[in-house]
Amino acid sequence: MTKIDLINLLDHAADTVAASGILIYSPGNVESPHRLTYAELRDAAQQNARRLGCMEGFAPGSLVLLHLDGYRDNMIWLWSLIYAGCIPVMSTPFAHHEEHRRSHLLHLQSLLRDPICLTRQGLEAQFPPDVGFRLCNIESISGGSNPFTSPRLGQPPGQDDNVDDIALLMLTSGSTGHAKAVPLTHSQLLSALAGKERFLQLRQHGPSLNWVAFDHIASLAEMHFHPIFACIDQVHVAAADVITDPLILLELIHRHRVGITFAPNFLLAKLLDSLEREPSPSSRPWDLSCLMHLLSGGEANVVDTCARLARRLTQDYGVPSTCIKPAFGMTETCAGCSFNDRFPTYETVHMLDFASLGRGVKGVQMRVTSLSTGQPVDDHSEVGNLELSGPSVFRGYYNNSQATRDSFTPDGWFRTGDLAMIDAGGQLVLRGRSKELICINGAKYLPHEVESAIEDAKVRGVTPGFTICFGYRPAKAQTESLAVVYLPAYEEADVESRSQAQNAIIRVGLIMTGTRPYVLPLDAHTLVKSSLGKISRNKIKTGLESGAFQAFEETNNRLLKLRQSTPVVPAGNETETLLLAAALHVFRVTADEFGVETPMFAFGITSLDMIAWKRQAETILGHEIPMLAIITSPTIRVLARQLQDGHHGPGEYNPVVTLQPHGSKTPLWLIHPIGGEVLVFVSLAGLFADDRPVHALRARGLNRGEPPFGSIHEAADAYYQAIKRVQPHGPYAVAGYSYGSLVAFEVAKRLDQHGKDEVPFFGSLDLPPFHAQIISKSDWTESLLHLASSLSLIAEEEINTLGADLRGLPQPRAIQKILARAPPRRIRELDLSPDGLMRWTKLTSAMAQATRGYVPVGQTRSVDVFYTEPSGALATTRDEWLDRHREWRQFGRLETQFHPLEGLHYRLMDEDNVHKVYRVLSRAMDARGL
């Protein structure tokens, strides 16, 4: 039986589709490509192979580093080396820093055992003369007197040929930053190509389109070898042209009737942004119905971004709705080995923030093993180590036995280094790299989730797509901290923009991790992206830890200290001094960063920080500070004045609490859930920093002597008047959380009562419109149980089991039993006393009674419904819960929009979920023109 290898692939394509081949656009030219047929490529490769065979150092089996620019040179000389029986090693771009470049080349010289390097004369200057690389430029290669002869030239190999011989080596970065060499054999590549073709079926579609350099396996395997395997045309364009203007990608798809291309998440985001800037689809009359596969990998795919792009491409240009296919692959698997052909439907149903990656293709088996035992897991929800096996997976690193031992299990499975789960639907879901997890005080955070939250915040002064997060342990620290580096979009001397960007990033970091991140802007020469658009998180982390960025740190610190537009004001009296001391301790900031006139909520303080500061300040001052005084005081100076004047009792009821005063967009008004407290919104408000002001409305009855509202309408009247005092004119954006949805609806109607459409946005956060009749049936005990669950004093499933135990007990005894079951740490975090919980429960019960007889009527301009996983007491399935939410349709004049949210009803504003709520809420308001 005749065996085949890569040479047979090109021979077959050259003989079968003589007119087909490769179109190459030169950098800066996207109008007139150069054409190279597969037959011409084979002829050039065979001719060069004969010449190489006459030259010393190019014997069959020799390693040759291929360091060339441009697709044409790389293709011709890659195949020339393969035909000559040599093993090409695809070089990666060299670092600009001379010492880093020298270190890399010395490492390659050792790793590859003193190879020859094939390059162009114009690139030889990139090699420091003291490194001693053996260079051979392609211009000097000419025909010799002894032609290279081999049975591999122009005819299939004989039966004795070993198809497991190494075909080529790819270089990939290791954990130390030094490159590892990945050997790809003929049999491995052929297995991978067969698996890809079985899934993608390129033979049935048009050409491929590539913009990625040949040093990346996605370009070489997916966009060069695979089209040859499928005997279809391939188009190549310079990366700089596509990244500079992503719409060129669509223009070329239309022009060449492209069936498959590739774009990582960052390019999809740029493409969406470019399309949204277009005046109308008619300005670009493209027909993109030919595009079957828009593969995406290399970084996590944000579902919202990709789904919006998919809708735009489908509606405006005829692209199939399942065109975008998030994929997983590595150099070690010959690029893509798992493709998601159910995007975005699968992600929408399962409410994923980041796209799943489908199922493994033929030739690759996948398993997830336990982080603790190393055994394969059976639980589809368990995150573990992703491991691969099969003929499409490599067998070990070249000349690096230690890395090979570390990367394979005793039973021969490849450890990818990724954390993952394979869900009940068989879909691969990545959860980050195991070595990149950020561990802070025992809690683990995924860097790409923090990066995504910063991107979502659209921080002014931060270049999109150039933010990197990682764990960083300063000297003498007991735990890791979060470090965030970014590429500034402002001039170096612009200290105002520098300070605003830093503060905004700090706010997001606090909300995501509960800790204050270390923030550092770096320049474009340092934050260099790979050919696939990735920045090496490990290299940046190593640079920070080694002191390589000391100059950036000194410049950043010096310029931040120069900022005087909002000077940090020191304490002016004893009360301010004591309050400030408590704040500096609890908020983990210095007196240079935080003063008595620093806006507390805008600074990024979380609700738990606020409670901890309250407790610390009370200890120092020796008396209680009402929470009302704190949340109604924007600064320490205002709070100190209240305390000194004795005006920290109940006073006159004012429902408005400004949580975030900054921003130019329409203010957002948030109405409390049952229980009446607004601290639940603190973290959410912080994410809107510099975007739009955020005000919350607190219930009457939280303080001694305040009577609760007797009805939904009474509360709505009070809130309407309060909103009008602060914001006399529309447009208005109003949202309510749970119980607050009913009040918010009534407030929106009052604001909209003159028919001027002054409320473009009314949002209901997880409560159906006719739920008042259920709430009104809650007695005091049920109010206590639901309040305790919402405060995380008890688990949600304990509501029913504890009900029978508490019912009939005296109220003080029931309070004691709840506090006895609650985690002590949670009680301390909430600063909760029996008397405080009693008052809170009475208010909750009174608010429940206020819903008696309430039935929503009338309409507001629009309704946006946000719904979660249902509580067992409210609905048994998500579909049942959504059906109840659909009743909101009758209360909006425009089409009601429904937005799924992750998490449970009572946990929406928790640290794990709040940034996701922000993302969905913010985009819903943008869609309503706000």
UniProtKB/Swiss-Prot annotation:
Q: Which reaction does it catalyse?
A: 2 3-(4-hydroxyphenyl)pyruvate + H(+) = (2S)-2-(4-hydoxybenzyl)-3-(4-hydroxyphenyl)-2-furonol carboxylate + H2O
Question: Is Iron found in the keyword set?
Answer: no
Q: What Pfam families would the database entry show?
A: AMP-binding, PP-binding, Thioesterase
Q: What is its EC number?
A: 2.3.1.-
Q: Which residues carry this modification: O-(pantetheine 4'-phosphoryl)serine?
A: S607
Domain Carrier: start-end pairs? 570-647
PANTHER family, A to Z? LONG-CHAIN-FATTY-ACID--COA LIGASE, MALONATE--COA LIGASE ACSF3, MITOCHONDRIAL
**Which GO terms of type biological process are on file?**
fatty acid biosynthetic process
Question: Which pathway is this protein engaged in?
Answer: Secondary metabolite biosynthesis
Which family does the similarity line name? Belongs to the NRP synthetase family.
Protein's name according to its UniProt entry: Nonribosomal peptide synthetase btyA
Region called Thioesterase (TE) domain, residue ranges: 667-920
Top-level EC class: transferase
Which segments carry the region annotation Adenylation (A) domain?
31-440
Give a yes or no for keyword Phosphoprotein in this entry: yes
Q: Which UniProt keywords apply?
A: Phosphopantetheine, Phosphoprotein, Transferase
